Amino acid sequence: MITFKEKLNTLFDDYNKLITRKNVPLEDGNGIFTRYKYPILTAAHTPVFWRYDLDSESNPYLMERIGMNATLNSGAIKWNGKYLLVVRVEGADRKSFFAVAESPNGIDNFRFWDYPITMPEDVIPATNIYDMRLTAHEDGWVYGIFCAERHDPAAPAGDLSSATATAAIARTKDFVNWERLPDLKTGSQQRNVVLHPEFVNGKYALYTRPQDGFIDAGSGGGIGWALVDDMTHAEVREETIIDRRYYHTIKEVKNGEGPHPIKTPKGWLHLAHGVRGCAAGLRYVLYMYMTSLEDPTRVIASPAGAIMVPEGGERVGDVSNVLFSNGWIADEDGKVFIYYASSDTRMHVATSTIDRLVDYCLNTPQDGYSSSASVETLKRQIAKNLKLMS
């Protein structure tokens, strides 16, 4: 019979093999980005000493005491030379919390810090918190904006599913100690808010996503833009929709900003998610657009369709057919690390460059919003290529 110590050694050996496994780029890409063979974080990547009581007296059978279900939707930042993710970790009890995982190279060897983040509560405590967007703002703080979920107080008796969503705000300078600021005041529910990294006209700028309910965007028109005077008492008084939803597109049901945009010489690069309905439920994909440096509310490029969709094993998980990203890192040499979750279950990385992503945005045809328009766009490319091939 295997002893407690032998089983414990096996647990740690298997864990160390997992977190030190070298990731491998997949070379069958589309020229825009490169996927990698292995997920960078799964529930199994959470430390053994989080999940198991290692005391042979209190846990003689070495049972898992605190189960972890998923690692997903992670904010990202380059910090002191390391690639940091503020990971949404979901426990077996369905509660999410934040934990920092760091890597020396951004593609593998991600290791969780010993303790998860202790996030201070708002005046009204939240039941669940998740999906943090990180922004190193020019005011000197790193802000994390995330969704705070609470049971809807207006729900009928017995309705234990209705919820409300607010944009919670916290800031830090070391990722250990966080200052919780009041939730964003808005005229609608908000679960998808991102802070622009620079002041605009002396104010803080937010990308928003107004919606009528906890899930449904309803009358919310798309990705919004708002200016606020003070992040310590942030209030949206006026919103402008800068990236609209459209019928029969990848973003007809709803869309939302992912991480904060990347500044390039030709404009701001944006990564977002789009949602449409299908027979299998809601399908989440990733898409890009660009806005002007002089006027960040003006869209200057909007490629048709998705840049990234679920493939292979990415399509299966707790919420299948979903890709979601709220974190990317642009290195000094122009390399871009795109961190995305698949099917609300695991984290992946894809790499590209600023030059490639700008080229993709500026030179990919826009959506014509009809089958006939799509055919005409395709015919133009076919004619050009046939001429080159002749």
Model-found features: residue ranges?
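Short, surface-exposed ligand- or partner-binding patches at beta-edge/loop junctions that are enriched
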Residues: 337
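Beta-rich carbohydrate-recognition and catalytic domains
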Residues: 1-73, 77-127, 136-194, 198-253, ...
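Extended, compositionally biased non-globular segments
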Residues: 323-327
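Active-site/ligand-binding surface loops and adjacent short beta/alpha elements
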Residues: 260
